[in-house]
């Protein structure tokens, strides 16, 4: 039996989906335990290219059971759209290989609307939300103002619960934002079209996972986003509204006794960021555009150009510590092949002093990157599958990162396809 978490070390978009898709060959169950439809996990395999926002990335493996845990922001509309897209490419999805926790809270129609209304109100002070309703959803969850997926089996009680929530929510929608109020007819339409359609997948997933654990199954826990977007440990308030750490896996999955055997932290070979907030190493102009195009750095959910920069050792080391990673997968090393020399941020300059410690969020806006340049390899490495076949300069780059973030790099990704990987 093995329990493994796949987590992001930086701002998200590190390549968690492609690593889950690769490593699930050795696992029986994959669990998404937090987050919602606000970030995408890109997977390229024999079925095609996919950007998964809610479906666990193990959905392409025939013998893997995929679970959406109680910690997930369950967006029925987006989930059904993903199921259609994936099954349309020949992937089989049934209640046997996709299970939704009866204790997962439903993302309701007003959550997405309120997200957009608040971003519009904030104007130039906005957080850069993907407008998928995540912050309003989690706010309501902690106010106990959401609907559990299990309530879908009790339509009469559910409608009464929704009516109470609607009356309360309309005070905000109309009273604060001046937007049109919701009606029960609108909610009935939403239930008929989306809510009830996911009922076949809803079950006691915590009970299922306990049985899987007791029978010696290998279970993988797939996180969304990364350490620097964690609600408690990220760059607050430019975070997501859930905990993106491996430590949340027991709570968000329903396996309270869970002990993780390994925590694989995913690190991109350079830095990217979607959304607002301090980004110490940010590149601009032509230099940034070259890197963005080389790495196809556009948001999987929004299509927005990602902010890009050199690898930030200070932020990455902090992310490794937050996640307590046991090993690292370094992704997109091949993207840097066009550079003659490769910049790396080794320290920050803050108030005239050098530091290699990640500062408190308030201070980050004043931090400046201290860069060191490494020799590039200036060639295509996407066909290489053995560590010793990499150019010496590429190996030097990887070992430098390994030594300075304090965690062994076991996997080196040299392309987006499943087999474009070097295992050390």
What is the meaning of each model-derived region?
Residues 1-424:
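Non-transmembrane, aqueous-exposed alpha-helical and coiled segments at domain scale
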């Amino acid at each position: 039996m093995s329990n493994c978490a796949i987590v992001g070390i930086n701002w998200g978009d590190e390549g968690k989906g492609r690593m889950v898709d690769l490593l699930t060959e050795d696992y029986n169950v994959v669990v998404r335990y937090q987050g919602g439809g606000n970030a995408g996990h890109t997977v390229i395999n024999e079925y095609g290219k996919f950007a998964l926002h809610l479906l666990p990335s193990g959905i392409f493996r025939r013998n893997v059971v995929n679970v959406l845990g109680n910690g997930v922001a369950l967006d029925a509309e987006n989930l059904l759209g993903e199921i259609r897209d994936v099954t349309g490419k020949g992937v089989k999805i049934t209640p046997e290989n996709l299970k939704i926790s009866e204790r997962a809270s439903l993302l309701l129609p007003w959550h997405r609307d309120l997200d957009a209304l608040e971003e519009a109100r904030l104007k130039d002070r906005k957080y850069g939300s993907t407008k998928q309703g995540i912050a309003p959803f989690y706010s309501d969850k902690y106010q106990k103002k959401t609907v559990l997926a299990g309530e879908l089996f009790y339509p009469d009680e559910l409608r009464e619960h929704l009516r109470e929530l609607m009356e309360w929510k309309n005070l905000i929608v109309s009273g604060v934002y001046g937007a049109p109020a919701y009606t029960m007819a609108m909610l009935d339409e939403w239930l008929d079209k989306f809510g009830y359609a996911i009922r076949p997948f809803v079950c006691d997933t915590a009970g299922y996972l306990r049985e899987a654990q007791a029978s010696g199954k290998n279970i993988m826990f797939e996180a969304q986003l990364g350490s620097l977007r964690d609600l408690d440990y990220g760059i607050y308030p430019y975070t997501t509204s859930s905990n993106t750490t491996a430590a949340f896996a027991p709570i968000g999955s329903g396996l309270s006794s869970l002990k993780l055997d390994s925590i694989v932290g995913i690190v991109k070979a350079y830095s990217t960021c979607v959304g607002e907030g301090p980004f110490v190493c940010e590149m601009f102009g032509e230099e940034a555009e070259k890197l963005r195009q080389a790495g196809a750095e556009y948001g999987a959910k929004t299509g927005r150009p990602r902010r890009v920069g050199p690898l930030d050792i200070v932020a990455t080391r902090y992310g490794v510590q937050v996640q307590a990673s046991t090993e690292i997968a370094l992704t997109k090393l091949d993207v840097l092949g066009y550079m003659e020399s490769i910049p790396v941020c080794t320290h920050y300059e803050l108030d005239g002093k050098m530091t290699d410690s990640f500062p408190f969020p308030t201070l980050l806006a004043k931090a400046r990157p201290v860069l060191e340049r490494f020799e590039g390899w200036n060639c295509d490495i996407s066909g290489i599958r053995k560590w010793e076949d990499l150019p010496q300069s590429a190996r030097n780059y990887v070992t430098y990162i390994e030594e300075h973030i304090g965690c062994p790099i076991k996997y080196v990704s040299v392309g987006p396809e499943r087999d474009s990987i070097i295992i050390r």
